[in-house]
């Protein structure tokens, strides 16, 4: 309602670029590494003493780690290499070389759950919310295979799904999950 896309300069490595400042809300863009796509950005939102950072599509990045330092909520995309490689093998065995190639290529420009967890730990964030889950969770028990030990690196996490939401009450340290999915 009333919003429209606006072009902005590409943020520099290690810097946040303010793209919106209104009524105490600050939205800043940051450069992320989604090679071969360039530029690619994530966003940091700050309001009344609270903050969250959404990575956008990216591989593990020291830039994210630096710019996410101390945020309340890190919303980080992640791809499970152990499962994607099984999908690669299945596509290859079925003779679908195009799909098999995609499954290998995407490993180069997405973070794994363990890499996102390491970023969250190193950045000293309050909570890690995984999103843009690859492959999607479609069967019971798949989350354990997907997370694949990353919980040992950063145990304060949620694997996102449609409808998951969080509240960060102003001027507090509370991180409250308000919905767990549809």
Give residue ranges: language-model regions.
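Core dinuclear metal-dependent hydrolase active-site scaffold
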Residues: 2-69, 163-182
